[in-house]
Amino acid sequence: MNLPSPLDRLRLPIIGAPLFIVSNPALVIAQCKAGIVGSFPALNARPQSLLDEWLHQITEELAAWDSANPDSPAAPFAVNQIVHRSNGRLQEDMATCAKWKVPIVITSLGALEEVNKGVRGWGGITLHDIINDRFARKAIDKGADGLIAVAAGAGGHAGRLSPFALVQEIRDWFDGPLILSGAIANGRAILAAQAMGADLAYIGSPFIATEEANAAPEYKHGIVEGRAGDIVYSSLFTGVHGNYLRRSIEAAGLDPDNLPEGDLKTMDFGGGAEAKAWRDIWGSGQGIGAVTAVQPAAEYVARLAAEYAKAKAELLLKTA
C-alpha cells in the first residue's frame, strides 16, 4: 500500500522503537537524520516540563538538518504515550505534543478515541501497538490510523504470537499501515516483515547498543554479547509480560528460571515504579544476536540499508 504522510518519506522502512529510559533526543535525532522514524516515550522526560524542552530540541535540530540537506531530509519523529489509567501525565503530555504538532504518536496499553482525535486535529497520525487481533480491532474502532503488531521475541512488553500468525490475522481485514515488531535486527528480517504483509519494521533492542543511547555501558555490552537464549519472558517486573536480559535478572539476585508471576493490578506508570524496574532489569528482544558492536546509530542504520538491498537482490535471483 501507499503509506500516508508522514510515513511516506523514509529512506528505509523502519521505525526506531521507543525504549523506556534509553531513548533520548540524541538517539531520536540520529535516527531521523539517518532516514528512519526516531521515537521516545513521553515518560522518559522527567519532570514533565522536560518534555517541552526535548520536543523543542528535536524539532529545531531536524529543521536545521533539512535546511542544510534538502536532498536528504530527516524522517519524522514519534512520541510514545502510555494510555493506561495509571499514567497521570497523559493529558499534560498530550497538550505538549499538540503544542509542537508531533507528527506521529505511538499509543500503548490502552486505546482512547479522544487521543486519536486530538492527534488527527493537529495533523498527526496515531499508531497503536497490539499483541493480538482482538486488541488490533479495538484500536482501529477507536480511531487509530495504523497498528504495530508486537509479536513473540520483541523486547520489553511483548506478545506470544508468531509474527506469521499475527500479521496474517490482521491483514485479513485491515489494509492500513502495519508495522511489525519482534526480533528484527538485520536487513533480511526487514524484507521478511514486508514479505509477510507488514509495511515497516519496528526495531528497538539493537539501538540500545548505540553511542547515543541513554544506557549503562554494561547494558550496551549485554546486548552485544547476548543471544536469543539469553532472553527471559516474565510478567514479574511490571505486571505485563515482557522480555529481559538474563544477566540483569541474575544480577538482581533472582533465578531467571523460577520467577513468580507478576500482578497486573500493580502496574503503575505514574509513581516511578516502572522506571525502577526497567533501570535495574534490562529489557531486550530475541534478535540481539545480530548486534556485533556498540556504534553510532547512523552506522547501524547504514548497515541495515546495505543488508536490506543485498537481501532483495538475492531474493530476486532465487525467484528469477
Describe these PLM feature segments.
Residues 1-177:
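Active-site entrance/lid segments in N-terminal catalytic domains of soluble metabolic enzymes
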Residues 160-179, 185-320:
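Conserved active-site-proximal phosphate/metal-binding subdomains
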